[in-house]
Amino acid sequence: MSDAAGLTTLAEMVRDRAKTRGDAIAFEFEGCTTTFAEFNIKTNRVGNGLKALGVKPHERIAYLGKNSDLYFELLLGAIKANVVMAPVNWRLAAPEVAFIVEDCKAAVLFVGPEFIALVRNILDRLPSVRAVITTERGAPECRDFTAWRDAQSTDDPDVAISPKDIAIQLYTSGTTGKPKGAMLSHANFFNLVQTGSDADKPDWNKWTPDDVSLVVMPVFHIGGSGWGIIGLYHGAKGVIAREFDPTKVLDFFEQAGITKLFMVPAAMQFVVRQPRARSVDFSRLKYMLYGASPIPAALLKECIEVFKCGFVQMYGMTETTGTIVALPPEDHVEGSERMRSAGKALPGVELAILDPDGKPLPPGEVGEIATRSGSNMAGYWNLPEATASTLRKDGWLRTGDAGTIDKDGYLYIHDRIKDMIISGGENIYPAEVESALCDHPDIAEAAVIGVPDDKWGEAVKAIVVMKPGKTASVTDIINFTRERIAGYKTPRSVDFIEALPRNPSGKILRRHLRDPYWAGRDRQVN
């Protein structure tokens, strides 16, 4: 169900699906269902409500909450008013949340019930926020979302929208430690989903009216919001999980008849290792799409045995609106060299391997992975220099990942040129963790690296140099850091060293610290 010829904006998509799939279920969340026709009306109300609050086209709103059907009402309702949604990672510490909300100059902050206390404590640091609306009752100082929405007109907001306008702003961590808002346009999303007719698509990329998609990755990730939008585009039913819980994921398979889903490998491991996983009926499951971090071969083999469906590895990033490379089910052959690859470029996506000067390298040589397609982001919000260093004038986006392309077009990822750590699908930059570590009164300097971890892919390891005559326990350092940054960024282990290795210019030689932990592995990511 993907006939959407002539549509150029996500607002048009919602209207079209209300006409063509009106009585079908768009979303199911914790026992409540919303049809496509109802979704169209609810998003009209949200768009009109934002207009009534004085939110102008191209302004931002923010959402701090877990997955819900209301989030997608907000996202698409804002889009109808040409307002940009900026979902916030709810795992972040209060200062990090405040930075994102104020960085995007959110006019309205929508907040889930679990985070009202956090918002109350940082509200004085959010001068741009004109209203706070809670998605569930229980906060007297906040407006109630349902009451606010239902008081609005059901008429279409009727706001002019261009395909080049920004639809969503997703924050991705920066090498300086400050998150960057990647601006994704309507055109970016349509380039992602409109990859030719169904006749030209591989089976794993085809959708039917009977498909049931599970939205289980957090909506502040492209794997959450983007996956939800893809399901809407195809007119499929989307079952929304409030947050990832492996036992509930198994319940969804049994009760909702899930046919497609996207998960990160760490989540797959939690699900497949559940005691009842081997007794669950997965017969309706057609394809499991996975990505955001590589998957250990042993885990993939176990998942294939248990889920008994087609597997598709996805490679992409927030800045490319998600997937640009896919390894299809037919290449998931145990012992095959291609199992080490990330797959081949999707239709309409160009790939290149560049040398340090930005010149293309021949097949088999290692360099920086670059990509060019209509899915490349519009840029980073209010960061022209960062945008220019990532997006070249000729349209090529430099990923910061190192890899090779073989003669058949398969992409092999070797390492990250940037120092980012991926733990359980979450992006973590060493500079941010190092900054928190160096606030410790007894630490002279610190370096942070990612080390192999069977559960999370990579785990954060801190390597610290103590000040002369000072000592601290591993537990003390970890607890100190946890008070300053999100829990998933906190080091899982700490090593002590007399001096950090540096090159003549004084730059820390992070590779020297990492190499002992990655010895004997094909690639320096896990």
Give the positions of each predicted feature.
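Conserved AMP-binding/adenylation subdomain of ANL enzymes
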Residues: 190-212, 220-259, 273-274
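Conserved AMP-binding/adenylate-forming core of the ANL superfamily
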Residues: 2-7, 23-68, 72-76, 93-98, ...
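Structural core segment of the AMP-binding/adenylate-forming
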Residues: 48, 52-53, 80-148, 468-470
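AMP-binding/adenylate-forming catalytic core of the ANL superfamily
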Residues: 92, 98, 109-111, 253, ...
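Flexible, low-complexity linker/hinge segments
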Residues: 1-8, 140-166
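Gly/Ser/Thr-rich phosphate-binding loop
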Residues: 233, 255-263, 272-336, 350
